[in-house]
Structure formats: C-alpha cells, structure tokens
C-alpha cells in the first residue's frame, strides 16, 4: 500500500494531525483523541507498514506502545494539510 492509499484510509488524516502536534503519542492517547480504536488500529498498522509512522515499545509495565511521525510522515502530513486547503 502506498502513501496515498494509506492517506485514504479512515482515521489516517486525524492520526497525522495529532502526531504532528506532539513528538510521540501512546496508542491510548490516540484512541482517546480519535475515539475509534478499530479505525485507529487499522490506520496505524498501515502507516507503520508504509513507513509514515514509527512504532516504539516502551519499557514500562503493561508494555505500552508509542507512535511518532517519520520524516516521510511529516512530509505527507504537510502535503495533506495543503491539499485540505484547496
């Protein structure tokens, strides 16, 4: 799946917008902000596979996971914002 296909998935643009505002966010923070755990999970898996987002396991109890934008993800986020202005 390429970046444009991932961008078309429900929830992807919201995840990009949220991650653009913070260096990294835990999965639970993303779910709380977006409100759709299944949608968020699918979007994140596709974004990690497309190398738009890095997934990092945190060394804490309950093995939480955090996500952050890659350089490619930052560029796509900027492009999506510009397209949204049209």
Predicted regions: what they are:
Residues 59-80:
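Basic, amphipathic "hinge/linker" alpha-helix immediately C-terminal to the N-terminal HTH DNA-binding motif
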Residues 34-49, 55:
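Short amphipathic alpha-helical interaction segments
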Residues 4, 77-84:
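Hydrophobic alpha-helical core bundles mediating ligand binding, dimerization, or RNAP-core interactions
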Residues 2, 14, 43, 64, ...:
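Amphipathic alpha-helical recognition patches that constitute DNA-binding helices
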Residues 1-39:
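N-terminal helix-turn-helix DNA-binding core of bacterial DNA-binding proteins
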Residues 23, 51-52:
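Glycine-centered, phosphate/nucleic-acid-interacting loop/turn motifs that mediate DNA/RNA or nucleotide
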Residues 26-28, 45, 65:
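Residues within the helices of the helix-turn-helix
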């Amino acid at each position: 799946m390429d970046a444009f296909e991932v961008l078309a998935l429900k929830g992807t643009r919201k995840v990009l917008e949220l991650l653009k505002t913070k260096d990294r966010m835990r999965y639970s923070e993303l779910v709380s902000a977006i409100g759709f755990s299944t949608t968020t999970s699918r979007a994140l898996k596709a974004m990690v596979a497309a190398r738009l987002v890095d997934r990092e396991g945190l060394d804490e109890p309950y093995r939480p996971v955090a996500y952050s934008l890659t350089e490619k993800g930052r560029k796509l986020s900027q492009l999506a914002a510009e397209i949204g202005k049209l």
